[in-house]
Design a protein with these regions (language model features):
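Repeat-unit-sized solenoid/scaffold elements
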Residues: 82-92, 116, 182-190, 210-217
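Short loop/turn segments at connectors of secondary-structure elements within structured domains
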Residues: 112, 204-206
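A short, polar/proline- and glycine-enriched secondary-structure boundary/capping micro-motif
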Residues: 95-96, 163-164, 206-210
Length: 217
């Protein structure tokens, strides 16, 4: 399953097109993809989760739906605090992206209910021929349960810095920006795993995410 996810992506990480709009789309969509964080339910007692999945643009970009793989791990170190991480790589065409990231999720709420979470996450995108990217994401979410479905709703901001490498393209030497978004996720239990879907919405574009979450212990 994990191999299929890592091999099924169709995103673009090169500047060969040369068009300024295309170059900025590559960088912005990459940063938006990296803003995704694992949906660790603070109301459960499980301490470790593994969450593979994929994210995709909701509209076509240069004739294609750009799709990216995801692989997150989360470890609750206390009742209120979890450490999250991304560490994986894959191959696509002439590129071999490497993703390395870590973050913290803090849970808070009423006396007996931790139904709010806030997170900070830094992720680096390396191993590319045309650029490297660093992103920092901050968000706040509210957990709501309805029957057998758990929802995570909130908003966040992604701050990114990109550095371009020299090559046969006209991309700027560096780019940086901020992407604000509204996020909604939904999880439901199916046998021994949680199945989830979510979306992050920005005025300029929307990205949808599908994932399977395994609670290890």
């Amino acid at each position: 399953m994990l191999t299929c996810i890592l091999d099924s992506q169709s995103a673009e990480f090169r500047f060969d097109n040369g068009d300024d709009g295309f170059v900025r789309s590559v960088v912005n969509r990459s940063a938006f993809w990296l803003s995704d964080s694992p949906a660790m339910n603070p109301t459960t007692s499980n301490r470790v989760i593994l969450q593979p999945g994929f994210s995709s643009s909701l509209t076509r970009l240069w004739g294609e739906y750009w799709t990216y793989p995801n692989l997150d791990i989360g470890i609750k170190v206390t009742r209120n605090l979890a450490v999250t991480g991304k560490l994986f790589g894959f191959s696509t065409g002439k590129e071999s992206p490497q993703i390395l990231g870590a973050g913290l999720q803090y849970y808070f709420g009423g006396t007996d209910t931790l139904d709010w979470s806030t997170s900070i996450q830094r992720v680096d995108l390396k191993g590319l021929n045309h650029f490297r990217l660093t992103s920092l994401t901050l968000d706040i979410r509210k957990w709501i349960s309805w029957k057998f479905i758990h929802f995570r709703l909130g908003m966040g901001s992604n701050f990114f810095k990109e550095v371009s490498y020299s090559g046969n393209h006209n991309a700027p030497a560096a780019m940086e920006g901020q992407i604000n978004f509204i996020g909604v996720d939904a999880l439901m239990r199916y046998t021994i795993v949680n199945i989830g879907a979510g979306t992050r919405i920005n005025p300029g574009w929307t990205m949808v995410t599908f994932f399977i979450q395994k609670e290890l212990f």
